[in-house]
């Protein structure tokens, strides 16, 4: 299976009463995955998430009810169309929402900041071969590579519907500067997994993952106030 990523990046979208977003949502196919970037406001909690999902579902945002899955992954509550799968992540004032049909995406974003404990954390939680590869990097590159691995692992685990408690050492990933890729996953076929780094700018690192065939990933920025 090819691990090449088909990615189209679009200019900032205006969401005038959701009309533009509705046009985008209507085009979501089984071979696509939509990723939205928006400003995270703690006071609004899941309101923007529900509003965006409502556009895809064709219902008002306040009609979108979410429930937590077995391991805390948010899901659409019945009787909503649960064939629409989503995941979201936020860090600082940035948030990402992944939306798909026919697969369960996992997404994770982290803001870049000094992480003096990056290597100790890696040595405690990561796979032995990842640790060795990180140690082989220049010290100036280790923190960025650590964050790339961390967000990638989070994305895969979230796509599985699991959390960190599953064990970060139970999956092994390609270590930067190699492209993102699942090399081994305990209890599953690693070649069935897609893992891609998202173009979120120099202030963050983000990855999206799903199990299944390659999809076209479309990346959008939701206008503030949308």
What spans do the regions from the language model cover?
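Core catalytic alpha/beta fold that binds nucleotide/phospho-ligands
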Residues: 2-226
């Amino acid at each position: 299976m090819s691990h090449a990523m088909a990615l189209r990046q679009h200019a900032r979208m205006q969401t005038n009463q959701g009309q533009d977003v509705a046009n985008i949502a209507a085009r979501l196919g089984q071979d696509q995955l939509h990723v939205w970037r928006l400003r995270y406001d703690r006071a609004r909690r899941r309101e923007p998430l529900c509003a965006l999902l409502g556009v895809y579902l064709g219902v008002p945002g306040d009609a979108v009810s979410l429930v937590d899955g077995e391991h805390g992954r948010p899901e659409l509550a019945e009787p909503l169309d649960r064939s629409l799968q989503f995941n979201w992540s936020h860090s600082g004032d940035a948030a990402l929402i992944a939306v798909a049909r026919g697969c369960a995406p996992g997404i994770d974003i982290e803001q870049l900041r000094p992480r003096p404990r990056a290597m100790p954390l890696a040595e405690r939680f990561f796979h032995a071969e990842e640790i060795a590869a990180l140690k082989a990097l220049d010290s100036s590159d280790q923190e960025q590579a650590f964050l790339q691995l961390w967000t990638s692992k989070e994305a895969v685990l979230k796509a599985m519907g699991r959390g960190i408690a599953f064990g970060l050492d139970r999956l092994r990933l390609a270590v930067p500067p190699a492209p993102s890729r699942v090399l081994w996953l305990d209890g599953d076929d690693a070649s069935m997994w897609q893992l891609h780094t998202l173009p979120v700018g120099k202030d963050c690192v983000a990855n999206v993952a799903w199990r299944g065939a390659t999809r076209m990933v479309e990346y959008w920025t939701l206008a503030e106030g949308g």
